[in-house]
Amino acid sequence: MATSKKPFQTNLIKAPNVVTRWTEQMVLELEQCKDPITGPAYFLANFFFIQHPTKGKIKYEAFQYQKELLDAYHNHRFSVNMLGRQLGKTTTAVGYLLWYAMFIDDSTILIAAHKYTGAKEIMQRLRYAYEVCPDHIRAGAKSYNKESIEFDNGSRIEAQTTTETTGRGMSLSLLYADEFAFVPPNIATEFWTSISPTLATGGKAIITSTPNSDEDQFAQIWNEANKRFDEFGNLTELGLNGFFPYMAKWDQHPDRDEIWANTERSRVGEERFRREHECVGANTLVTLKDIYGKIFEVTIAEFYNMC
C-alpha cells in the first residue's frame, strides 16, 4: 500500500511517484490492467466505478453492446460510433480514456465536446472514476484541474469545447469527439479539417454521437465509413475513409422492450424516435448488394420503399 503523503490535502488524488508496498495480488492486477490487448476490458470490469443518480457509487458492468463498443474504441485507430440516446457511450469512453492515459505512457488525449457543459461533465465523470480507483492501479497526478489532468507517466488529458481551432497545434495520441453530430456544421467541418493533420503521426480518433441530421460532418464520416466493399464486392473491415463503424440501437439494451419503445414513441413522436433511438434518418446511406453481386447505395427512405 502507498505510504507517502498525499498532495492537495486529500486522499482522493494519488501523489506523483509514490512508493508502493506491493503484494502478489496487487502486482497481478496491475499487470492485467497493463495488458495491451485485454487490459481495457479488465480495467473497466474491475476498477472502473461510476456515479449512479440514485444508487451512488457502483461498479461499471458492461452490456454486450458496450463490450463491442469498447472493442471498437481499442482495436481500431479510427472508429465512428452511432448510438441511440442513453446507451452509455460516453460512460464507456470515459473508462477507456482513463485506462489509456494511465497505461499508455506519454499520451496526449483531447476530449472535444459539443458544448462547455459537455466537456465539464465528461471530465467530472473521469475525475470521479480516477478518485475512487485503488492507488496500486492508478497513476499519480502531477496536476489536477477541472479541465485537465497530467499524470506522472507523462500522459495528460484535456477537455475543451469543440471550436474551429480546438486541438490545433497539439500532437495528439487520442482524440475523443463526443456528440459530434450536434456541433454546428460550419464549426464541425473546420474543426475536422484542422484536427486531422494532428493525427497524422499515428494518433487515434474516437467519434461518438446520436444522429442529428443527414448532412453534418458526423453523418459524412459515418457514411464514408460504411462504404465497406472492395472492387471485387468483398466486405472490408474499414470504410473508404479508414474508419471502423459501430452502431447500437435501443433494443440492444437489455432493460428496454417494446413497452418502453411504445411509451417513448408516444412521448417524442415516430420521426424523432427513429432518429434518436433507431439511429436512422431519411437520407442516411446504406450499401446493398443484389443477387448478381452488384453494389449500390440507397437512402434509408428508399430502402423502406423497397421493402
Residue ranges and their predicted role:
Residues A2-N283, K289-C307:
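Phosphate/NTP-binding elements of NTP-utilizing enzymes
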